[in-house]
């Protein structure tokens, strides 16, 4: 999952992913939309493929890219869990975190 976080940290890759939300795209379409050269696009697509965020399928002379929505669902679940879970309000999580921090500070002072 770490590769996915690194991949989406880059604004060009996020732009590519956003464009792929509209459906399958060829490498040429992606390069034009992202306003990057073929070499830079190749690098970005490799990072996205290694993170398993996009799928690629060869169709004749073209490579067609699409989103791997399963990985995005896993990322969303992981982030939701990290932020405090689906059934827990964020306000409650923040209060609990502050209570733990305060408790640790009191223990350190003793």
Located regions from the model:
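Beta-hairpin "wing" of winged helix-turn-helix
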Residues: 49-59, 66
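Short, hydrophobic-biased segments on the C-terminal half of alpha helices
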Residues: 45-46
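Single-residue recognition of alpha-helix boundary sites
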Residues: 24, 55, 79-80
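Short stretches within intrinsically disordered, low-complexity N-terminal or propeptide regions
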Residues: 42, 53, 101-103
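Extended rod-forming repeat segments used as scaffolds/tethers
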Residues: 17, 50-51, 104
């Amino acid at each position: 999952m770490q590769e996915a976080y690194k991949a989406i940290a880059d604004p060009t890759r996020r732009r590519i992913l956003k464009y792929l939300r509209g459906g399958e795209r060829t490498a040429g379409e992606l390069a034009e939309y992202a306003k990057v050269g073929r070499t830079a696009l190749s690098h970005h697509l490799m990072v996205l493929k290694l993170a398993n965020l996009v799928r690629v399928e060869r169709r004749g002379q073209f490579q067609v890219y699409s989103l791997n929505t399963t990985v995005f669902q896993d990322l969303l679940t992981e982030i939701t869990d990290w932020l405090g879970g689906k059934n827990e309000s964020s306000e409650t999580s923040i209060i609990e975190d502050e209570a733990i921090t305060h408790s640790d500070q009191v223990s350190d002072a003793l």
